[in-house]
Swiss-Prot record:
Record keyword Endoplasmic reticulum present: no
GO molecular function: argininosuccinate lyase activity
Single GO biological process annotation from the record: L-arginine biosynthetic process
Catalytic activity: 2-(N(omega)-L-arginino)succinate = fumarate + L-arginine
Alphabetical list of Pfam families matching this protein: ASL_C2 (PF14698), Lyase_1 (PF00206)
Keywords: Amino-acid biosynthesis, Arginine biosynthesis, Cytoplasm, Lyase
Record EC number: 4.3.2.1
Name this protein carries in UniProt: Argininosuccinate lyase
Family membership noted in the UniProt record: Belongs to the lyase 1 family. Argininosuccinate lyase subfamily.
GO cellular component, as recorded: cytosol
Length: 469
C-alpha cells in the first residue's frame, strides 16, 4: 500500500494531515501482529466485562461490545485478519471492524485502556501459550527418549570425549542424558511462566487510570495470578519475551547437540543409526544419498533462535521508560523463534521415535580404542591396592604395548601384562570386557544397565506414563 491518506481516526485529532507513504509502511505492524488476534479479542472481552461490572460503561453497551467482538473473532477465524496499513495494528483493526458491526458503542471499549497496556497484555498471553506449547512438545520428546532408552538399557556403545573413544556406555544411558537436558528446558519454560503470569491490563499508557477499574477481575478472567504492581514497568517490560527466548535458545542448543549426534551416527564411517525416510532427503545428482536434512536444519535453526534472542536484547538494551516504538519490533523475533522451536522439537521427537539403531555396529565400535583402559586401572586400584595415579601409568604402558601390536587390551597375554607389572594376574581379564565395564558403573546415575533401567522407571513415573510403585 502506498500514498497519503486521511488522518487516522483513532489518534488523528491533533494532526493537520495524514502520514506519508513511508510513515505508513514503517509504522504498520499488522503484517505480523495479526498473530495476536485471539489474545486481543480475549483481553478486550475481559476488559469490557470489567467496564460493565464497574459501571464505567452501561451493561447494554458492554453486552453489545462483547457480542460484536465474538463476531469479529468469527470473521478472523473464517477469513483471516485483513491487512490495512492505515489501521496500523491488530488493536485498531479489531476496533475498526467492531465499529462497523455495532456502531458508536465500539468507541467505549478503549475506555481506561491504552494500546500500551493492551499490547503488553496480548503479547504476554501469546508468549504464555507458546511456553505451554513448547513444554508439551518437549514432554513428548522426553517420552520418546525414555521409550527408546528402555529398549536399549543394555545395548553397548562407545562413550566419547573429544569425539574419541573414552569408555563403554549403553545407548539407553546416552539417550537418558538428553532426557535430563530436555527436563531442564521444561523447567526453564515453567519458571519463566511463573514470573510472567501477571496482568499489565489497566496500566493504561504508563501512569494508570482515573477510572474505578478492577484490575484483579481482568487478571483472573485472563488466567493471570494477579495484576502487575507498577504501571510504568508494566507497559515497558519485555522480560517475559526475553525469558521465553532465553529458554528457547538454550533448548535449541540441546536439540542441536542431539541432531549433531544423529548426523554423525548416520554417516557411513559410524553407521550407528538408520534415520527414518520421512525425515531424510536425497540428492539431485547422487542416487545413493540419504541425507539427514531434518537433523541438519534443526542444527541450523538453533543459530537463528539464538539470533532472535540477541535481536530483542539489543532492541531493549537502551530504552528509557516507558513505551517506545522500538518495542514494536519485539514480536517478530519471538514469533520466528517459536515457529522454529516447534518444528525442531517435532523433528527430533520423530527422529528419536523412528530411528533404527544398529546396536551390532555400536557394540563392535565399543571394542575399539581401548575403551576398557580405565577398567584396567580401576582393577589395579581394587585388587593390587595401587594408588590410582600409579595404576594410570601402568595402564598407559599396557595400552601402548597393545597399540604397537594392533590388538585389544584383553588380547595381551598374561605374560605381557606381568612384564608391565607383576601384580597383574588372570583375574584381570574378567574386568576387560565391555559388558563387565558397563556393569561395573553402578553408581547413582551411572551407565550400568540396572541403573539405567532404574532411571527409566523413575522417568516414566515423572512423565505420568505409569504410577509409582
Amino acid at each position: 500500500m502506498s500514498g497519503n491518506s486521511g488522518s487516522n481516526q483513532m489518534w488523528g485529532g491533533r494532526f493537520a494531515g495524514g502520514p506519508s507513504a513511508i510513515m505508513r509502511e514503517i509504522n504498520a505492524s499488522i503484517p505480523f501482529d495479526k498473530a495476536l488476534w485471539r489474545q486481543d479479542i480475549a483481553a478486550s472481552k475481559a476488559h469490557v466485562d470489567m467496564l460493565g461490572a464497574q459501571g464505567i460503561v452501561s451493561a447494554e453497551d458492554a453486552a453489545l461490545i462483547a457480542s460484536g467482538l465474538d463476531q469479529v473473532a468469527a470473521e478472523y477465524e473464517a477469513n483471516g485478519v485483513p491487512e490495512n496499513w492505515d489501521l496500523e495494528d491488530i488493536h485498531m483493526t479489531t476496533e475498526s471492524r467492531l465499529a462497523e458491526l455495532i456502531g458508536p458503542a465500539a468507541g467505549r471499549l478503549h475506555t481506561a485502556r491504552s494500546r500500551n497496556d493492551q499490547v503488553a497484555t496480548d503479547f504476554r498471553l501469546w508468549v504464555r501459550d507458546a511456553m505451554d506449547q513448547a513444554e508439551l512438545g518437549l514432554k513428548q520428546l522426553q517420552v520418546a527418549l525414555v521409550s527408546r532408552a528402555g529398549e536399549h538399557a543394555a545395548s553397548i556403545m562407545p562413550g566419547f570425549t573429544h569425539l574419541q573413544t573414552a569408555q563403554p556406555v549403553t545407548l539407553g544411558h546416552h539417550l537418558m542424558a538428553y532426557y535430563e537436558m530436555i527436563g531442564r528446558d521444561r523447567s526453564r519454560f515453567a519458571d519463566a511462566r511463573v514470573r510472567m503470569n501477571r496482568s499489565p491490563l489497566g496500566s493504561a499508557a504508563l501512569a494508570g487510570t482515573g477510572f474505578p477499574i478492577d484490575r484483579f477481575r481482568t487478571a483472573e478472567a485472563l488466567g493471570f495470578d494477579g495484576p502487575t504492581d507498577n504501571s510504568l514497568d508494566s507497559v515497558s517490560d519485555r522480560d517475559f519475551a526475553l525469558d521465553y527466548l532465553m529458554a528457547a535458545a538454550q533448548c535449541s542448543l540441546h536439540l542441536s547437540r542431539l541432531a549433531e549426534e544423529f548426523i554423525i551416527w548416520a554417516s557411513q564411517p559410524f553407521g550407528f543409526v538408520t534415520l527414518p525416510d520421512s525425515l531424510s532427503t536425497g540428492s539431485s545428482i547422487m542416487p545413493q544419498k540419504k541425507n539427514p536434512d531434518a537433523a541438519e536444519l534443526v542444527r541450523g535453526h538453533s543459530g537463528r533462535i539464538v539470533g532472535c534472542l540477541t535481536a530483542l536484547m539489543i532492541t531493549m538494551k537502551g530504552l528509557p521508560l516507558a513505551y517506545s516504538k522500538d518495542m514494536q519490533d519485539d514480536k517478530p523475533p519471538v514469533f520466528e523463534a517459536a515457529s522454529l522451536l516447534a518444528l525442531s522439537i517435532a523433528a527430533m521427537t520423530g527422529m528419536v521415535a523412528e530411528a533404527k539403531f544398529r546396536t551390532d555396529r555400536m557394540r563392535a565400535a565399543a571394542e575399539l580404542g581401548y575403551a576398557t583402559a580405565t577398567d584396567l586401572a580401576d582393577w589395579l586400584v581394587r585388587q593390587a591396592n595401587i594408588p590410582f595415579r600409579e595404576a594410570h601409568h601402568i595402564t598407559g604402558s599396557a595400552v601402548k604395548l597393545a597399540e604397537s601390536r594392533g590388538i585389544a587390551l584383553d588380547q595381551l597375554s598374561i605374560e605381557d601384562l606381568k612384564a608391565i607389572d607383576e601384580r597383574i594376574d588372570e583375574r584381570v581379564y574378567a574386568a576387560l570386557s565391555v559388558e563387565a565395564s558397563v556393569a561395573a558403573r553402578c553408581s547413582h546415575g551411572g551407565t550400568a544397565p540396572d541403573e539405567v533401567r532404574k532411571r527409566v522407571a523413575q522417568a516414566r513415573v515423572a512423565l505420568g506414563l505409569e504410577e509409582s510403585a
